[in-house]
Curated annotation (Swiss-Prot):
Its main location: plastid. Residues 1-56 form a transit peptide. One of its GO terms (cellular component) is chloroplast. It comes from Arabidopsis thaliana. This is Senescence/dehydration-associated protein At4g35985, chloroplastic. InterPro entries: Senescence/spartin_C, Spartin-like. The gene is P85.
Amino acid sequence: MECSATPPKLYPTVDTSTTVAPLPKSSSSSSSTNNNNLYPSINVNDLVNNIFPDPTASDSASAPPLATEEVILTIHGAMVHLIDKSYSVELACGDLEILRLVQGDITVAVFARVGDEIQWPLTKDEPAVKVDESHYFFSLRPVKESESSDHSVNETENEMLNYGLTMASKGQEPMLEKLDKILADYSSFTAEEKQKEENVLDLTAAKETSPEELKGKRKKMVEKQCTAYWTTLAPNVEDYSGVAAKLIAAGSGQLIKGILWCGDLTMDRLMWGNDFMKKKLSKAEKERQVSPGTLKRLKRVKKMTKMTEKVANGVLSGVVKVSGFFSSSVINSKAGQKLFGLLPGEMVLATLDGFNKVCDAVEVAGRHVMKTTSDVTTEIVDHKYGAKTAQATNEGLSAAGHAFGTAWTVFKIRQALNPKSAMKPSSLAKTVVKTAAKERKKGKKSSK
């Protein structure tokens, strides 16, 4: 057997003569080697040009938008009074400006300002009422002082600041329509309506005065009449604001006029109001003595203006503190908690639309009273003065007056009235008076 035979190989033989060594990358060889490349080519132009944005652009986008102050409305010939039973004090006279603080696309706060002296916030938890073509009033709960924590409930209710706004409305009707729209958007606004044949208070000076005339000889006459006007309506405004604050705190953004403004013998009360107005006008010069309570309210007015200015400056500088503007009852209520949770850290201007939340009993009873009462008016003056002239100075309760100025809430009204039964005005009055009397007794016991 021959030994020259080669043993079989375990691996196949590789022909290295056809292997091409890798060539360096060049423009000339890229086209020739494109077919031999195992991976697809990548075009750099198809990639995103700048995956990471410029750091300066990132910083500017994350910064909070700059807050600005906008004047959305200016009306000439405005006069503001602090409404008081003894003597309504004039606070300022000049141009009315509605200011809006805006941060980006968000409205942070809205203020009303007259001249450079008085300024107050417009919020959905504070009532604003249009009495007629020339008169508005605003009810504000002032910033609580530390030493007032031990005051009684009645004293706390009397701490409401009521501002009476009088406009020289001659020739400014379109501007006042804009004002009504703004108040409807940013406050708990109610426009009262009166019948054409009714003239609650014989006061037409403001309506027949233009802003130019207010700067001349007519100014003194208008000032006297406005002081008398707001002093006359002071009891009604205080009762109204007390009820409005309670209903708003319970989740209602609007009062039901059928209940709050119902009453008999309307003409007697209108005559009483006109006589009272004439007396105030004839004695306006003598009634210059301001009560101690009025002096305290004047101090609170200044504090409210200063607080409003602080908030405006805080918003413009990026630091906002607004809790002082809202009463604790609103903050602690369920509706208030939902409201304040909408825009944390901002002055809340969201809607507290509570008309649908008011119980059906009040609506049904209110509509029934409106239909069955012989003479019903929606004027402020009718809210206080009772069924007879002799009851005007009486401390007794009536269906259209004091009964709704007590410590009522919408939930107690629901318990007092039955919506399924057709209630007469007399039975409504009895129910209201009984409930109000119980509340007054409880208040006296607690004060003792």
